[in-house]
Structure formats: C-alpha cells, structure tokens
Amino acid sequence: MAWKRELTLAALNASSENTMVAHLGIIYTRLEAGLLEAEMPVDARTHQPFGLLHGGASAALAETLGSMAGWLMTEEGQCVVGTELNATHHRPVSSGKVRGECRPLHLGRQSQSWEIVVYDEKGRRCCTCRLGTAVLG
C-alpha cells in the first residue's frame, strides 16, 4: 500500500509542534508503505499516579498514529476525524519509551480502520488499539 500524500518524517514531526503530540514527546520514527511508527517517552508526562504508563497516554499515541496515517491516505481537500478508539492494555510500562506501529485494516472512501500496536523497549506488546476514522471533504 502506498500513501496518497508524500511527506517526510521531518514534516510529520514539524506538524506536531505546539500540540498535545509534542507535549507528550511523541516523535514519528518510521514511514514506509503500509506502516507509520512513532515513539513516546514513559516519564512524568505520561505516567499515572502509580508511576506506570497511563492508559490515556497509550490511547493518545494510538489516535495520533491512526489519525495521521488516515490523513496520509486522503486526497487533497480531505481530512479524517476519529470516530471510535478501542484499547486493550496487556502489560505495564514504568520507564523508557514505547513504540507504536500503525497499519490499515480497512481503507474505504468514507471510513477507515487502523490497528495500532504499542510495544515496550524489549519488543513486548503492551497495548493493542483499533481506531475508526471518518473521511471528510
């Protein structure tokens, strides 16, 4: 699968300046056919009160990846908005960083579905997410 829009990782990361994405420290790290990847630190910004990665931070990473991937699959003048996010948390993470990998499940004219898997630094699956998006425009 080829992306419909051609952007560099630098351009993707620049688009996140002064947003929640930047505040959480999310950085896009890989863009290739059918895969968008990003990393997020596990630190005070993303911890819950017990010192573990907050489930909402994992969800924010997933929605960030799925929404950007969805936009990369639209035509000029179109955008995507999230319609549903499901997250299943498999294991805790207390420090370091996590990596999210986003791949398409369904790419329709009006809707898309994305799977985002979050891994810890040892490559263990920590969270599995599915994001639904609507294509507007």
Curated annotation (Swiss-Prot):
Compartment(s) where it occurs, according to its Swiss-Prot or TrEMBL record: Cytoplasm
Alphabetically ordered keywords of this record: Cytoplasm, Hydrolase
The UniProt record lists the keyword Hydrolase: yes
GO biological processes: enterobactin biosynthetic process
Gene Ontology MF, one: 1,4-dihydroxy-2-naphthoyl-CoA thioesterase activity
Chain segments annotated as transmembrane: none
Gene Ontology CC: cytosol
UniProt-listed Enzyme Commission number(s): 3.1.2.-
Pathway entry: Siderophore biosynthesis; enterobactin biosynthesis
Catalytic residues in the record: E63 (nucleophile or proton acceptor)
UniProt xrefs under Pfam families: 4HBT
Gene3D superfamilies according to UniProt: Hotdog Thioesterase (3.10.129.10)
Its job: Required for optimal enterobactin synthesis. Acts as a proofreading enzyme that prevents EntB misacylation by hydrolyzing the thioester bound existing between EntB and wrongly charged molecules.
Family to which the UniProt record says this protein belongs: Belongs to the thioesterase PaaI family.
Subunit-level organization: Homotetramer. Dimer of dimers. Interacts specifically with the aryl carrier protein (ArCP) domain of EntB.
PANTHER family: 1,4-DIHYDROXY-2-NAPHTHOYL-COA THIOESTERASE 1, PROOFREADING THIOESTERASE ENTH
Protein name: Proofreading thioesterase EntH
